[in-house]
Amino acid sequence: MHKYKCIFIHIPKNAGSSVMKALGDSGGRFHVESGYYNEVNDYFYKKYHRFAIVRHPLERLFSAYKYSLQGGNGSQSDKLLADKIKSNSHDFASFVDALLDMHFIMQHKLFKPQYLFVCKSDLALNIDTVLHFEKLADQWPAFAKKHNLPHSLEFINRSEKVSLPILTSAQYKKINQLYYFDFELFGYTPIDVN
């Protein structure tokens, strides 16, 4: 993003396509951790403003689940993931029970904890700014103005707002544990399990 002297860390299912479009990048999605940019070009990584968008872990998880069920971006790996989910679960609750574990979320970027995209191994942020998906309509204009970015942000790939499925206390507890650092580091309250 040389034009804007910024590096956008695109965490899946967090309005990344909207930001990429606003910045004029139509080269496709590129979901890598912030450390990758640092290794590839340390000079620009230190010089440019680095930012990402985070989202409530449960809402992001449900969005990734729905997206995956539909075949994701249509790639072979996304189709295989859809088949795996469909053959091992029949709804979101059974997906949480049957598939959602540390191995699964580390194996599939759509489900990978957000902190792994933007934090160093000591959990310190490796970027300059964290924006929140839930507040993006309010946060983006001031952020864009400060960094000379396009002020309008057209939300694309946005799914209809649906109520999250009701889960059991054990399922909520599992999500809280798997995404503990996302809740802790980005200011989200863990899901009430009572």
Language-model segment annotations:
Residues M1-N194:
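Membrane-interface amphipathic segments in extracytoplasmic regions
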